[in-house]
Amino acid sequence: MALLDSMTLPERMAFWRGQMERCLRCYACRNACPMCVCRDYCVAESRDPHWMTQEDSVREKLYFQTIHALHLAGRCTGCGECQRACPVGIPILALRQQIGRAVSQLFDGYKAGMDPEAVPPLLGYELEEKNIHEREWK
């Protein structure tokens, strides 16, 4: 994780593109995840609406992994089952942890599994989130 944190954004993107070159898109990471709730209706396999293609491209693989990481943001406990299940050894937990850390920073330090009463940040909706200042975006 420290190595990824020390990289520039273009370096991180190159790293993940290289990892996605090796991805088989077998969904072992998704299937092994105890927090994933979309096994029965996953965007990667949905035909209505048609969110993703079955194209074997780095773009589509990175798209799936990013969507999956965002779906888990705020819920991933860091157990590492996704990474252990990967037949080609992609360090996918690092992507989930990076996105989880960004969510934690945006949503007042939320950590998955610490408070059973807390609602994961991306499962709720506020018209204006406290730490996201959309009106200032240009």
PLM features: residue spans?
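Ferredoxin-type iron-sulfur electron-transfer modules in oxidoreductases and energy-metabolism complexes
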Residues: 1-21, 37-138
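Hydrophobic alpha-helical transmembrane segments of multi-pass inner-membrane transport and secretion
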Residues: 23-26
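Structured, non-catalytic alpha/beta "coupling" segments that mediate domain-domain communication
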Residues: 28-31, 35
